[in-house]
UniProtKB/Swiss-Prot annotation:
Homotetramer; dimer of dimers. It catalyses: L-methionine + ATP + H2O = S-adenosyl-L-methionine + phosphate + diphosphate. Pfam families: S-AdoMet_synt_C, S-AdoMet_synt_M, S-AdoMet_synt_N. It comes from the Bacteria. One of its GO terms (molecular function) is magnesium ion binding. GO terms for biological process: one-carbon metabolic process; S-adenosylmethionine biosynthetic process. Its EC number is 2.5.1.6. Binds 2 divalent ions per subunit. Binds 1 potassium ion per subunit. This is S-adenosylmethionine synthase. The gene is metK. Keywords: ATP-binding, Cytoplasm, Magnesium, Metal-binding, Nucleotide-binding, One-carbon metabolism, Potassium, Transferase. It comes from Streptococcus pneumoniae (strain JJA).
Amino acid sequence: MSERKLFTSESVSEGHPDKIADQISDAILDAILAKDPEAHVAAETAVYTGSVHVFGEISTNAYVDINRVVRDTIAEIGYTNTEYGFSAETVGVHPSLVEQSPDIAQGVNEALEVRGNADQDPLDLIGAGDQGLMFGFAVDETEELMPLPIALSHKLVRRLAELRKSEEISYLRPDAKSQVTVEYDENDRPVRVDTVVISTQHDPEATNEQIHQDVIKKVIKEVIPSSYLDDKTKFFINPTGRFVIGGPQGDSGLTGRKIIVDTYGGYSRHGGGAFSGKDATKVDRSASYAARYIAKNIVAADLAKKAEVQLAYAIGVAQPVSVRIDTFGTGTVAESQLEKAARQIFDLRPAGIIQMLDLKRPIYRQTSAYGHMGRTDIDLPWERLDKVDALKEAVK
């Protein structure tokens, strides 16, 4: 009998408390970068009933109305009704942003490689904003080269948001979660969806029967290809029986609490660093994007069916301390060849990544819900497949 395995990933909507925090942090980052592309930003957000606290470190000469950015972001998400216990115009906003530590700044502004060196490469100037390890991943399970469980989970909560904002389902409220369990065959290929879990906040008048019917018909069956669904697929829709109190009224939220949702749904390893609120000198963010860029181009070049890239850095040092690529036995060339090619083709110094992916632009708010990787609805530079030919040539 062939061995089949299950794998599960989850996603959350833009109205989930942790995602509200992520979106506020990235909206602040974008507002600052729009006025000062050289700014250093580390903006953290905490949300709870009736309150938003924004704190962290920034280095910029630009003025940004933090209060307005916070309120506009909350309104765009859909928290405009005081009945939700959290509303854009009535929430208390408490900013507390201070200047970046000069001890950190000296290592970021002048990397170890150029200190005391008159013959400087401009891309050696910026040192990594912290030590750490970052992972990027790609797999040929979907068109966007993402694991199927997280890809479907994102699409389910995005569909819920579309139906809410268009008022096609008028009783929906902003907070929601999804979870998809996929069955894989003995060759590690997805064959069917075993279980779908969706919890969506709703008005008190909505009945469980109506929610169940609408979610299956207008969300699940609109998003998940019928070839993955069968009579054994299990659906759990609002399994607690009621989800009226939600968002920050139901749970507090913090920036950086959904790092697995932001990446690969647990299918690949994670270095532990969050993305939102951080400018691109923070390698937690920029190197994770670079690692995805490498992995996706490797898989798109048919050099592997599955690729995981690890990068690691020392604070204040420009060059990565290590580059590792794992193809899990699916590669068509040696992993050492891929590692050598990656170092040749992709500039993995922080300034090199920033230049390669044009990361000084205000592009981050759009990434802060529904995943930073595998997005097909927006143009993200780390999702481009413009290094395929160079990789093929490098490993000949």
